[in-house]
């Protein structure tokens, strides 16, 4: 203290606490004023003073001194309640995962902070001399944060990656931690069990790699002679004075500095504190300094480009190993801070916002023009203030004004009533914590399987134009519509089509059948079906076998030969619907093993489901026309007028279409039974040709004849055909052309044995053999078939109670399958006559096709199959029926029918089974979806377990509507309708009927003719969204009309239409907990599928909220599996205040990995530069200059990135250390494959200067481009293979070096250490015998004064040294 005493008159006495920062400043000023010797003497005295005071105080620390804060319990309870509420909001889809994490962190951080702030007053009041209290503010050991962990709560911890663990440690160290809290604490704490080893090794490995890259960099020369420099300017305000000073001190000027005409500093002068202060004072022009980047050599560095040595304030000495110093300077802070004994233990530190609260109850008023709506970072709605906003709170007798600063959130609305102490605004935390912010990505993963939907527009990310990455422009929900996905590994599986009905669980059980990709599709199909339909399954759980499937979906096989003969009249069927036909198919019978439609109708639908006009839709095989035995057909025909000009059966785009040349009327026709046996050639036949046998004669070893008669044997194509003609044989004297039918009562009257025939007979003339001339006559019995009336197929269809225009119709057509008048049929089961349904619609319509699809509905075990046919959509004009009112809103301006845009398929069942609310959970609809793997097709099975019904809402009040309850006898089978997705939802509306009323209270029911309908059936009032997203409405009656464009209810009045807002609209996504009825919120989120008067049916869905800028992975409608990445958020988060959170960042920058939200653009920038420069300068110089400019640009960017990380952690590292490292990782270029050169192979990494020199020597362009190497890759691409081998991959490096015959010139330190030589630094450094002559430098310097650009170009292109 004597020194201070000596200069007392000039000193000011400071009476304040000196903390660590003040002590640093004090020591710094001592060194400046008195030098190092005096300073150390003074500090010794300060140390002694401190020890004496501490001894006198004799403070000790016992466990009883740790006093827990009393208010902790209820503060923690409050935080837990907020967390539970937050979890609910996230589940409802009100906040997304990042907002939830952020808010959770801030809830606990605020709780922790309140506790910390309460700690000091608590100690001050209860025990002011508590040793813990005294120590925590002494600045010597420990701080408030650590004491808070002892007596408050440990709070939130960060894991080794710096991510926050959102489970807080609620205990403090005095109370002790639970097991979970201890493990979290181990992860987060700097001294934790887990952390210490990890961090030390990380920092050590980083140092090792850094040293490896630059170990050969030694100061070899005094001056390399460069004229280039990097300009530094404080003028633009981008650089703080502190950073500006730090950048300049210790550097060497690359050019003279002038103020006006006066030179205040010369080239090659090193910069000290005085010179820097002069620059700042005079605000000199941009200052050009020399840096390691501007040094001309890549393998060493010169004194002037390096500058002053950090150890002693003088130019660095020759032979100094500056590379190793640089590597250790960057790696060391990580190691040092990892091993620090005193730390807050990884506890999260961040800023919270200040709240403005209302001082009393009152009404809020502010200018709404100065705010705009937004979301807070917690997902709450708020107003953002763009500038100072004055908010007035008015009570009865008090008016209070509050000024809200800009960038703050206003949490209340204008004219809202607020209570005392209610938070009305949130002022963002000051910018002090901004340097602890970083941008990170957060991936959200799907926790359920299903189909992806979103309800907003999305943009393609520019770099992924054809990918499945989409950017959200605004806040919206992503929905996962639930359903069980099933993925086939074999590519398109042809047995399932979109909208097929399936058993939902059977596929998942049998997945293993479709796992081997080597088997063919047919094998799989066979296995697939044999596994399902072998009869092991319970009845009712099966789907048709393969042949039946072919019949149902008509794979092209058709049983029609010549369908040329039509039955007389073509009746129109009873069932006519506007643009659609619904055909229900009967359920399978008990014990039967085949799926048949009602009455044996076979439906033939092409695979693509598209039917043309006059297509055969279905055929019916009447059992009366089925013969179990083989035989021949015979009939006589009469030609009628031709009905269609086209000829015969035409196959048009895979659809069989009836276009017969003429129509024949047949009445009656005949079947002649003949027994036929088809035998193998090797069979031993026991009867002879032309022999006559009796009934039950042995024909072969294992066959007997069923009838007696004439035997004929024919050989055909390795088969033997054995035919037995029953009947009598006659040998008439005179044979005419005896091929004729004799009706009953016929015969020769003059014959002796004349008797009246009872049955039809067929007379056939035959020869015994081909060569004989003699004939005999075979008289055979005949089975006659009379023309019957077409079966009444009308009973297939429900009665059409809804009056509609007749657009789509079916015709019944009978025809004989076998057109040839005498045709042998050798099948054992023959259908002689087939009844067809032919699809037709009005000729004046321009529609060319109709779409058909199968629907299978199951209700409590009862299966109903339906075929649905819709005409393709087209703007059909709608003519109003006579009951339509003029203002009904059905006819739009352009005259097109609004209802036609969404044709509804109403599906009805007359089954008497009681339908309950419980649904069969195992039946579902297959929905074919897009899969990320292009080769395989994904199916999603939507079963009724994924749907739920909400309602009935009997208390919903519609204006102007009176409800009449119609009591029905519940035992009467009700007319019900089956819903979508194969579920048996009873979508009927049982006891509500709406009358419409005009203003004068006159019932308009009579006008609408609803009274009669009431007696017949219950009007269905519901709307349906099918699996394809089309909206259907049953157009049941005119009392409630859906406008598909606005999706609002319309209530119809006598002369005007009043629109009332809808409660829910079709296809709308509802979040959980949304109130849609008075009963309270509904309990599931999902999409509205069916809209009824009293209830809605929704398909379960899981909402995920996403904010603008989020990246959505996947396409609309794509299947997502559990655990798939759904969306990626990019958000800012507060960083833990430890250096090593930054260490991985440093490593990422130096290893040139992507760290930004949008990947690090340096490499893209490099490609862009190369292209532009080549275009501007042409080939020869373009590569060199392009690479050079790119490298300069990326070097500065990399240095700034590394410095930003370290500065944010409060660590000071001189730029030159980072520059030496960055110079090494940016000094190589990659030889490209644009043009082959004789010197370097494509893909080879070479130094930029070497490439340029080689190109100049060869006088040809070498194509290359700049690359950014990471430090690891740079270490493996040096001139020394010994150095590379000692780093990693030793065997590979040595083997490659041996093969290439590489030479190591032992220029670096490491290779000399390995071989035991003297290292070329320090005393082992050989000074060059003579400094090279400086003429080029002088010339270049003069040139630069004349023309700066010319000098720089010459420097780049010509002046280089090895």
From Swiss-Prot:
GO terms for molecular function: DNA binding; DNA-directed RNA polymerase activity; zinc ion binding. Binds 1 Zn(2+) ion per subunit. Keywords: Chloroplast, DNA-directed RNA polymerase, Metal-binding, Nucleotidyltransferase, Plastid, Transcription, Transferase, Zinc. One of its GO terms (biological process) is DNA-templated transcription. It comes from the Eukaryota. InterPro entries: DNA-dir_RpoC2_beta_pp, RNA_pol_beta''_euk, RNA_pol_Rpb1_3_sf, RNA_pol_Rpb1_4, RNA_pol_Rpb1_5, Rpb1_funnel_sf. Belongs to the RNA polymerase beta' chain family. RpoC2 subfamily. DNA-dependent RNA polymerase catalyzes the transcription of DNA into RNA using the four ribonucleoside triphosphates as substrates. This is DNA-directed RNA polymerase subunit beta''. It comes from Helianthus annuus (Common sunflower). The lineage of its organism: Eukaryota, Viridiplantae, Streptophyta, Embryophyta, Tracheophyta. The gene is rpoC2.
């Amino acid at each position: 203290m004597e020194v201070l005493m000596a200069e007392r008159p000039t000193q000011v006495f400071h009476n304040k606490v000196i903390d660590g920062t003040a002590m640093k400043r004090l020591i710094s000023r001592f060194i400046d004023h008195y030098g190092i010797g005096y300073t150390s003497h003074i500090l010794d005295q300060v140390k002694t003073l401190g020890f004496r005071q501490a001894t006198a105080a004799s403070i000790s620390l016992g466990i009883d001194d740790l006093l827990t804060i009393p208010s902790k319990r209820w503060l923690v309870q409050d935080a837990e309640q907020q967390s539970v509420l937050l979890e609910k909001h996230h589940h409802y889809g009100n906040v997304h995962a990042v907002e939830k994490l952020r808010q959770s962190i801030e809830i606990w951080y605020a709780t922790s902070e309140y506790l910390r702030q309460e700690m000091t007053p608590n100690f001050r009041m209860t025990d002011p001399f508590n040793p813990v209290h005294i120590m925590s503010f002494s600045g010597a050991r420990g701080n408030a944060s650590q004491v808070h962990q002892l007596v408050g709560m440990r709070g939130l911890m960060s894991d080794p990656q710096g991510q926050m663990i959102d489970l807080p440690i609620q205990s403090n160290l005095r109370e002790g931690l639970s097991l979970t809290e201890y493990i979290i604490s181990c992860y987060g704490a700097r001294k934790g069990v887990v952390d210490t080893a990890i961090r030390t090794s990380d920092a050590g490995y980083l140092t090792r790699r850094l040293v490896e890259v630059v170990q050969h960099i030694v100061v070899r020369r005094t001056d390399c002679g460069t004229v280039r420099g990097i300009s530094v300017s404080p003028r633009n305000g981008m650089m703080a004075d502190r950073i500006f000073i730090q950048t300049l001190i210790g550097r060497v000027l690359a050019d003279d500095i002038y103020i006006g005409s006066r030179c205040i500093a010369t080239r090659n002068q090193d910069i000290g504190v005085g010179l820097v202060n002069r620059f700042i004072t005079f605000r000199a022009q941009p200052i050009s300094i020399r840096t390691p980047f501007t040094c001309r050599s890549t393998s060493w560095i010169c004194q002037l480009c390096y500058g002053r040595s950090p150890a002693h304030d003088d130019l660095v000495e020759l032979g100094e190993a500056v590379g190793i110093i640089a590597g250790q300077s960057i790696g060391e802070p990580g190691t040092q801070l990892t091993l620090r004994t005193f730390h807050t233990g990884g506890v999260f530190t961040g800023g919270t916002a200040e709240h403005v609260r209302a001082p009393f109850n009152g009404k809020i008023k502010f200018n709404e023009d100065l705010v705009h709506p937004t979301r807070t970072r917690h997902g709450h709605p708020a107003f953002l203030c763009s500038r100072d906003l004055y908010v007035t709170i008015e009570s009865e007798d008090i008016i209070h004004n509050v000024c809200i600063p800009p960038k703050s959130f206003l949490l209340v609305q204008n004219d809202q009533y607020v209570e005392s102490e209610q938070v009305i605004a949130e002022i963002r935390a000051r910018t002090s914590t901004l340097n602890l912010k970083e941008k990170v990505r957060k991936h959200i993963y799907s926790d359920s399987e299903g189909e992806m939907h979103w309800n907003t527009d999305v943009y393609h990310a520019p770099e992924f134009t054809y990918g499945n990455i989409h950017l959200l422009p605004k806040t919206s929900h992503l929905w996962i519509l639930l359903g069980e996905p099933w993925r086939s590994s074999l590519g398109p599986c042809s047995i399932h089509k979109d909208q097929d009905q399936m058993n939902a669980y059977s596929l998942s059980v049998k997945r293993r059948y479709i796992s081997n990709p080597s088997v063919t599709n047919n094998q799989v199909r066979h296995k697939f079906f044999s596994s399902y339909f072998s009869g092991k399954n319970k009845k009712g759980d099966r789907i048709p076998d393969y042949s039946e499937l072919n019949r149902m979906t008509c794979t092209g096989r058709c049983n029609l030969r010549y369908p040329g003969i039509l039955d007389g009249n073509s009746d129109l069927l009873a069932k006519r619907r506007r643009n659609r036909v619904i055909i229900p198919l009967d359920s399978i019978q008990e014990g039967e093993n085949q799926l048949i439609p009602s009455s044996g109708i076979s439906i033939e639908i092409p695979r693509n489901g598209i039917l043309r006009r006059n297509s055969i839709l279905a055929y019916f095989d009447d059992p009366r026309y089925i013969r179990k035995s083989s035989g021949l057909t015979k009939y006589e025909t009469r030609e009628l007028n031709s009905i269609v000009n086209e000829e015969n059966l035409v196959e048009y785009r895979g659809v069989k279409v009836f276009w017969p040349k003429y129509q024949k009327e047949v009445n009656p026709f005949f079947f002649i039974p003949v027994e036929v046996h088809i035998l193998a050639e090797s069979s031993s036949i026991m009867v002879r040709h032309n022999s006559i046998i009796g009934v039950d004669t042995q024909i072969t070893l294992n066959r007997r004849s069923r009838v007696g008669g004439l035997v004929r044997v024919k050989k055909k194509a390795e088969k033997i055909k054995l035919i037995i003609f029953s009947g009598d044989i006659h040998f008439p004297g005179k044979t005419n052309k005896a091929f004729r039918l004799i009706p009953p009562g016929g015969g020769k009257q003059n014959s002796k044995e004349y008797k009246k025939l009872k049955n039809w007979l067929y007379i056939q003339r035959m020869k015994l053999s081909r060569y004989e001339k003699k004939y005999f006559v075979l008289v055979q019995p005949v089975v006659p078939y009379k023309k019957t009336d077409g079966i009444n197929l009308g009973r297939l269809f429900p009665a059409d109670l809804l009056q509609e225009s007749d657009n789509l119709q079916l015709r019944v057509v009978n025809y004989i399958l076998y057109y040839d008048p005498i045709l042998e049929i050798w099948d054992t089961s023959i259908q002689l006559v087939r009844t067809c349904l032919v699809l037709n619609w009005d000729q004046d319509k321009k529609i060319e096709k109709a779409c058909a699809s199968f629907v299978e509905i199951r209700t409590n075990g009862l299966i109903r199959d339906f075929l649905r046919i819709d005409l393709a959509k087209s703007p059909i004009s709608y003519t109003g029926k006579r009951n339509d009112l003029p203002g009904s809103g059905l006819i739009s301006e352009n005259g097109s029918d609004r209802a036609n845009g969404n044709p509804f398929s109403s599906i009805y069942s007359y089954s008497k089974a009681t339908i309950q609310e419980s649904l069969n959970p195992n039946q579902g609809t297959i929905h074919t979806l897009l899969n990320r793997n292009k080769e395989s097709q994904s199916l999603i099975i939507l079963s009724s377990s994924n749907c739920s019904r909400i309602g009935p809402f009997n208390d919903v009040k519609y204006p102007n509507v009176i409800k009449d309850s119609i009591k029905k006898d519940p035992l009467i089978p009700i007319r019900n309708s089956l819903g979508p997705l194969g579920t048996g939802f009873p979508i009927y509306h049982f006891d509500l009927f709406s009358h419409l009323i005009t203003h004068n209270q006159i019932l308009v029911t009579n006008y609408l003719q609803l009274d009669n309908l009431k007696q017949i059936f219950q009007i269905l009032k519901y709307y349906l969204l099918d699996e394809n997203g089309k909206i259907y409405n049953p157009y049941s009656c005119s009392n409630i009309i859906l406008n598909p464009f606005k999706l609002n209810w319309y209530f119809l009045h006598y002369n005007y239409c009043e629109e009332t807002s809808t409660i829910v609209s079709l296809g709308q996504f509802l979040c959980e907990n949304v109130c849609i009825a008075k009963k309270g919120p509904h309990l599931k989120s999902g999409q509205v599928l069916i809209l009824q008067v009293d209830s809605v049916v929704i398909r379960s869905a899981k909402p995920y909220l996403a904010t603008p800028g989020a990246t959505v992975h996947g396409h609309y409608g794509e299947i997502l599996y559990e655990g798939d990445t759904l969306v990626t958020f990019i958000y800012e988060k507060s960083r833990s205040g430890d250096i090593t959170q930054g260490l991985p960042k440093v490593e990422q920058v130096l290893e040139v990995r992507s760290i930004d939200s949008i990947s690090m653009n340096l490499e893209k920038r490099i490609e862009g530069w190369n292209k532009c420069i080549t275009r501007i300068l042409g080939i020869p110089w373009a590569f060199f200059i392009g690479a050079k400019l790119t490298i300069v640009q990326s070097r500065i960017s990399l240095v700034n990135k590394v410095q930003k990380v370290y500065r944010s952690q409060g660590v000071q590292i001189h730029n030159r250390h980072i520059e030496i490292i960055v110079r090494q990782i940016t000094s190589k270029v990659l030889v490209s494959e644009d043009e082959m050169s004789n010197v370097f192979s494509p893909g080879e990494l070479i130094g930029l200067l070497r490439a340029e020199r080689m190109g100049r020597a060869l006088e040809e362009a070498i194509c290359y481009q700049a690359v950014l190497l990471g430090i690891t890759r740079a270490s493996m691409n040096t001139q020394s293979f010994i150095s590379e081998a000692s780093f990693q991959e030793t065997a590979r490096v040595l083997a490659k070096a041996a093969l290439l015959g590489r030479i190591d010139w032992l220029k670096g330190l490491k290779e000399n250490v390995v071989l035991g030589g003297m290292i070329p630094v320090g005393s082992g450094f050989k000074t060059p015998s003579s400094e090279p002559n400086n003429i080029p430098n002088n010339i270049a310097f003069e040139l630069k004064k004349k023309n700066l650009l010319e000098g720089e170009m010459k420097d780049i292109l010509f002046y280089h040294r090895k």
